[in-house]
Amino acid sequence: MKKGLHPRYEETKVVCACGNVIVTASTVKDLRVEICSACHPFFTGKQKLVDSAGRIDRFNRRYKIRG
């Protein structure tokens, strides 16, 4: 490898808006993210499932689409 050509690969702190801090390695010094696996609804099990079956049925009735 040539000297001075490649970026430095160093320890990085990834800080989430929820306060969670993840230490990893990267060429970027520090990162701030809005959402992480500790607070994302998909990973915490608090996600909301949208039931669109009623809307689809209403659309099909309105336009008389048989399915």
Swiss-Prot record:
Gene Ontology terms for molecular function: metal ion binding; rRNA binding; structural constituent of ribosome
Stored InterPro entries: Ribosomal_bL28/bL31-like_sf (IPR034704), Ribosomal_bL31 (IPR002150), Ribosomal_bL31_A (IPR027491), Ribosomal_bL31_sf (IPR042105)
Residues binding Zn(2+): 16, 18, 36, 39
Pfam families to which the protein is assigned, alphabetical: Ribosomal_L31 (PF01197)
HAMAP family membership: Ribosomal_bL31_1
Subunit structure: Part of the 50S ribosomal subunit.
Function: Binds the 23S rRNA.
The protein's name: Large ribosomal subunit protein bL31
